[in-house]
């Protein structure tokens, strides 16, 4: 469905970032990364109080491929 898009400004895009404006049928990644982080790892703010006394992150992942990118060129 067509849309009218007003003015916009892009300050920064990462190396694997995607910016799409308008109609699109598929957006396919060109790279993949697997990130493991425990409780409170990605908190942001001015004054945080994180109370995670005993924490364990389960990193067991039994599948071989999470996001296939073989044919995404």
Swiss-Prot record:
Name of the protein this chain belongs to: Probable spore germination protein GerPA
Described function: Required for the formation of functionally normal spores. Could be involved in the establishment of normal spore coat structure and/or permeability, which allows the access of germinants to their receptor.
Gene it is expressed from: gerPA
Organism: Bacillus subtilis (strain 168)
GO terms, biological process: sporulation resulting in formation of a cellular spore
Keywords, comma-separated and alphabetical: Germination, Sporulation
Gene induction: Expression is sigma K-dependent and negatively regulated by GerE.
Pfam family, one: gerPA
Highest taxon of the lineage: Bacteria
Family: Belongs to the GerPA/GerPF family.
Keyword Lipoprotein in annotation: no
């Amino acid at each position: 469905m067509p849309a009218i898009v007003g003015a916009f400004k892009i300050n920064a895009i990462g190396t694997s970032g995607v910016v799409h404006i308008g109609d699109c049928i598929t957006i396919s990644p060109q790279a993949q990364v697997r990130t493991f982080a425990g409780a409170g790892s990605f908190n942001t703010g001015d004054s945080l109080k994180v109370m995670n006394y005993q924490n364990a992150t389960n990193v067991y992942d039994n599948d071989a491929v999470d996001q296939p990118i073989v044919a995404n060129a």
